Amino acid sequence: MSGLDIAGRYHFIGIGGAGMSVVAELLASRGARVSGSDRADSPVLERLRGLGITVFAGHDPAHVPADAVVVVSTAIRESNPELAAARGRGQRVVHRSEALALAATGMRFVGVAGAHGKTTTSGMLAVALRSAGADPSVAVGGVVPQFGSGAHLGAGDVFVAEADESDGSFLNYSPSVEVVTNVEPDHLDRYGSREAFEAVFAEFASRLVPGGALVACAEDPGASRLASHARERGITTITYGRPGRCAQRPDAAIEDVDSTASGSTARVEWDGQAAVLRLAVAGEHNVLNATAALLAGAALGLGLPEMAAGLASFTGTARRFEERGRVGSRRLFDDYAHHPTEVAAALRQARVVAGAGGVTVVFQPHLYSRTRIFAARFAEALAAADHVVVTDVYAAREDPEPGVDSTLITSALPGSLHVPDMHEAARIGAGLVDEGGILITMGAGSITSCGADVLEFWRRGEAQ
């Protein structure tokens, strides 16, 4: 972050991405001159234009101001014409995490990390803090209804953000509070092994400012090991979980968990205090996420009861088991799940919500490397659905791998269908949903665009 000026000029390549757009919005809110580009126009670009940010559809060296610091994510390749031109001119290029750290200058930074659960936990924490009067600044990878965006510049001194472990960029932060929802191995194309993945989280914990606190889920073996090592190094640590599912009794015990289609309840006991969670979101995993947010608020100095009251108003974030529409008694949901554990959690939530109705999934695998590594586990997780349609792999930043495609999943899951074309996948998936059933479009890529097709097929009665 050295040498970056909050009032400077910044050009974001790939500004339409969830992580990039929120940072661009926050920097602009703090007085920076911001521009950006993305491959194609989108509602995100239109929203940024409405905020006064100059954005372009398509990449062209002419879009890059000569005096701008160029901001990129790991997804941007060196061959990108704007990036190549900026490097050729000797312009400074920084990662989005460095720009985010700049946007948080002067605030108490709360970094929420973990292979899954980051967006929901960050959103929960932000909503609860706002309800408690803290008015935090926020950088979340999904739209939070209370803020109308994934970005918010608050009047308070707290900054809540997702801390991305996928490329190690969370090491650019110096948090006052860290939340680690889990350390379940992912991104093994980068890290290579569980040990290396856990090591980068240990390094993340060492980035806490003096007097900072680590909040970690004791139900997850990796996060539990992280907490133990942090304690050994003298770091203030708060663990949480359901005692019967933890190797050691957690500091904050979650009891009396109940989840129904309309929400979840639980009791949390910590440090002689108790709070009752009454959540408007279903799923036991959301009880864990809410407890993490509750304790992060406590680490910032807020009381458990006021944090619990704020959590009751959280209704979800975009693409996290988000209801997108209904036709008759059939309902459509959309979920960002792209790791087997996330898929399993989403389908447990789906079963609660669907009740006696059926559950159909249209799943888009994300990354060839993840598909290769987790194909069998994806098949196992998806087996919880009644019907499964799998589209082609969404490549994102990767090139295709020989022998790696979606049939690695469907061949391990009898009765599932591989349908490469997303429109066709939507038609087939829609036709598998009976009255009272639900369909979930699932994945971290472009799969959400199938939703409109599903609803249209239902409306027209064209699903076969």
Language-model segments: residues:
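Nucleotide phosphate-binding/pyrophosphate-handling subdomain across enzymes
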Residues: 2-11, 19, 23-30, 171, ...
